[in-house]
UniProtKB/Swiss-Prot annotation:
One of the primary rRNA binding proteins, it binds directly to 16S rRNA where it nucleates assembly of the body of the 30S subunit. This is Small ribosomal subunit protein uS4. Residues 96-157 form the S4 RNA-binding domain. Belongs to the universal ribosomal protein uS4 family. Gene3D superfamilies: Ribosomal Protein S4 Delta 41, Chain A, domain 1, RNA-binding S4 domain. Keywords: Ribonucleoprotein, Ribosomal protein, RNA-binding, rRNA-binding. Signal peptide: none annotated. PANTHER family: 30S 40S RIBOSOMAL PROTEIN, SMALL RIBOSOMAL SUBUNIT PROTEIN US4M. GO terms for cellular component: small ribosomal subunit. It comes from the Bacteria. It comes from Alkalilimnicola ehrlichii (strain ATCC BAA-1101 / DSM 17681 / MLHE-1). SMART domains: Ribosomal_S4, S4.
Length: 206
């Protein structure tokens, strides 16, 4: 399965919520009609079965983090092997992806931008260049940008926006050095309340 490169509003409308696929410069409601599913204008959202709800939640989270189906299932299997609530560990694994950490540190306005930054060898982890977006970042790791990446206008604009909005509690960023520390895996309370990971666990437990 290839990575989706079509209209991001279509995905957000499909799930009926913001998937944070846009830069956030303008409110998403001004771009996407989240209360209407994609398709004919008069089409309404139908009442879904339990399975449908579980599937939609899985698709929503998978698309939010930009992960393919096989990758997502592997994350679930790994989460089930680790100690702790499987749903919470699943989200922590997704949050620990290098592309997501770059996004959380404010070096990119979207996860897709962060993924591109990593793929183009613009990111260093503990002083070494890493071009694998799915790499798991460990607590204590230092993530920074190469000098060439620091000069990109979109990176500078993203970091300026992050300084205005603030950073998550689990990262510590030095904007002057274009680097930050991944302090710890985030607690569940620190993550989006709009994600119902228990539905994903129910789906994969069948």
């Amino acid at each position: 399965m290839a990575r989706y490169i079509g209209p991001t509003c279509k995905l957000a409308r499909r799930e009926g919520t913001d998937l944070f696929l846009k830069s956030g410069v303008r409110p998403l409601d001004s771009k996407c009609k989240l209360d209407q599913p994609p398709g004919p204008k008069l089409q309404r959202r139908t009442r879904m079965s339990d399975y449908g709800l579980q599937l939609r939640e899985k698709q929503k989270v998978r698309r939010m983090y930009g992960v393919l189906e096989r990758q997502f299932r592997n994350y679930y299997k790994e989460a089930a092997r680790q100690k702790g609530a499987t749903g919470t560990v699943l989200l922590q694994l997704l949050e620990s992806r290098l592309d997501n950490v770059v996004y959380r540190m404010g070096f990119a306005t979207t996860r897709a931008e962060a993924r591109q930054l990593v793929s183009h060898r613009g990111v260093q982890v503990n002083g070494r260049v890493v071009n694998v977006p799915s790499m798991q970042v460990s607590p204590g790791d230092l993530v920074g940008l190469k000098e060439k990446a620091q000069k990109q206008l979109r990176v500078q604009a993203a970091l300026e926006m992050a300084q205005q909005n603030g950073w998550p509690a689990w990262v510590e960023v030095d904007p002057k050095k274009f680097e930050g520390t991944y302090k710890a895996r985030p607690d569940r309370a620190d993550l989006s309340a709009e994600i119902n990971e228990s539905l994903i666990v129910e789906l994969y437990s069948k």
